[in-house]
Amino acid sequence: KSRYDENYSYEILANLDKYSIYDVMQIKHFNEDYTDTSTSYIEIKTRDISIYEYDDCVIDSYKIHNLQKLSKATNNRCFLCVIYKGDKKIALWEINPRKQYQPITKLANWHTANLADGKKQKEMVALPLKEAKIYSYQN
C-alpha cells in the first residue's frame, strides 16, 4: 500500500505469514535525496511470545546493519519496533549508527517460497529489553 501527499510516499510492505505481520515500514522521500529530510525510519516486527519470556529480542543482523547505514546516510534516527501481540506491549530500540552490535549465530525458523520451512543457521543480533522503551497499547 502507498499513500502519496505533497512531499512523501509512505510504503508499508506487509509480509503476512506466521512469523511477521508487518515486516517493513519504509518512508521514502519523493526525490530520493535523503540528506535534508527529518523523517525517522522504523522496522516493525511482531512476536507471538510473551515479552517476559526472554530478556532480549533477537533480530536478523542485516536488518540492524541496514538501519545503521540508513541512519548514517540520512543523519536521521532509525528504530526497531517489536510488537508483542499477546501482552499488548511495544518495545522500541533506537539503532545507533556508530555502535558495534555483536552478531550471534542462531538456529532459527526459516520461511520462504524458495526454501522448505525449517531451521537455518542465521546471523542475528540480540537487543536487550532493558535498552528498549516499553509501551502498552490497546486494540
Description of each model-found segment:
Residues 16, 29-33, 72:
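Short polar/acidic secondary-structure junctions
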Residues 68-99:
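Nucleic-acid nuclease catalytic cores
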Residues 1-18:
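Acidic-basic catalytic patches of nuclease active cores, encompassing PD-(D/E)XK
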Residues 20-22:
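Short beta-strand or tight-loop elements
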Residues 24-50:
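Conserved catalytic cores of phosphodiester-cleaving nucleases, focusing on short active-site segments
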Residues 14-15, 44-45, 81-84:
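Short His-Asn-centered micro-motif
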Residues 47-70:
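Mg2+/Mn2+-dependent nuclease catalytic core
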Residues 90-139:
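Intrinsically disordered, low-complexity terminal regions enriched in charged/polar residues
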